[in-house]
A protein has these predicted regions:
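Short, conserved acidic/polar surface loops in the N-terminal third of protein domains
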Residues: 66-70, 88-95, 149-151
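Short gly/pro/ser/thr-enriched loop/turn and capping motifs at secondary-structure boundaries
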Residues: 84-89, 244-246
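Active-site cofactor/substrate anionic-group-binding motifs, chiefly glycine-
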Residues: 66-85
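Conserved alpha/beta-domain cores
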Residues: 50, 58-61, 71, 112-129, ...
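A gly/proline- and charged-residue-enriched helix-loop-helix capping module
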Residues: 81, 88-132
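Conserved small/polar residues in nucleotide/adenosyl-binding loops
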Residues: 263-265
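An N-cap/entry alpha-helix motif that binds or orients negatively charged groups
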Residues: 2-43, 107-112, 116
């Protein structure tokens, strides 16, 4: 069954394949996998126990539409988003391109999502506390494309969503939002870190906050980010988003490359 579905989906447009997968999960067309918990795979981070190290990263379930089905597939955690305050269509299509020979994809999606109102409602409707008490939920947040001050959007998102997840991710790494990666420069990064931590304190919250970074930053930026993170007790960094280095796929398409290319960075 899986092999047949996989062959069919690979023949279709990549974004259409993704949308079909979401619809299939919504309809319950997937195998429910019963996993036996093995203590040797467990890891406790920030006081939260991850049953296994296998989870689903942000980008698949952008709108928190299929939380329960994803966790029923056996993942110990899922990261939802990236979500922005307002709905956003993203960049023009086609915006996902496959390169099977190179085991790579290029995407220029641009934070396409239905916005935080729909996102919040979907999480509340999933009854996570009743269905998956032992699972971990991450919430990945980012700014709208036309936002002038990124902290304004991050504040809106944090205030609305921090109670709904086990950890928050600040996405500063997408190459498909103009100017976003500039926030990884030391002065900008430190400003965001200190302001987000202050916002957490103002809400009397202890939720872990992670920052997702780019693979394309300079060695000096890597050093600066590391030192700033240590100095400010950052809970974690997520390495990494897609790269704009297209040497392995030899393409002039807009967007970021994921897949095998990242191993060599």
């Amino acid at each position: 069954m899986y092999n047949l579905a996989h062959r069919i989906l690979k023949k279709l447009d990549p974004e259409l394949s993704h949308n079909i997968s979401i619809k299939a999960l919504k309809l319950g067309i997937y195998p429910k996998i019963i996993c036996k918990n093995t203590e040797i795979l467990e890891q406790t981070i920030w006081g939260r126990t991850f049953k296994t190290p296998i989870g689903l990263s942000a980008g698949f379930d952008k709108n928190a539409e299929v939380i329960n089905p994803i966790l029923n597939l056996g993942f110990s955690f899922t990261e939802l988003g990236t979500v922005t305050p307002l709905p956003q269509k993203g960049n023009s299509k086609p915006r996902i391109h496959r390169f099977p020979a190179q085991k790579a994809l290029i995407n220029s999606l641009g934070f396409n999502n239905k916005g935080m109102d729909v996102f919040e409602r979907n999480i509340n409707n999933s009854n996570l506390k009743e269905n998956f008490q032992d699972k971990i939920i991450g919430i990945n947040i980012g700014n709208n494309k036309d936002t002038v001050e990124i902290l304004d959007d991050l504040k809106k998102l944090f205030d609305r969503l921090y109670r709904l997840g086990d950890y928050i991710v600040i996405n500063l790494s997408s190459p498909n939002t103009p100017g976003l990666r500039d926030n990884l420069k030391s002065q900008n990064f430190e400003k965001i870190v200190t302001n987000i931590h202050r916002l957490r304190d103002e809400n009397n919250s202890k939720i872990p906050i992670l920052f997702k970074i780019s693979p394309d930053i300079s060695d000096q930026d890597k050093k600066d980010i590391s030192l700033i993170s240590l100095a400010n007790d950052v809970d974690g960094l997520i390495l990494t988003n897609t790269t704009v280095n297209k040497s392995m796929v030899n393409e002039k398409l807009e967007g970021g490359v994921s897949g095998l290319s990242l191993i060599h960075i």
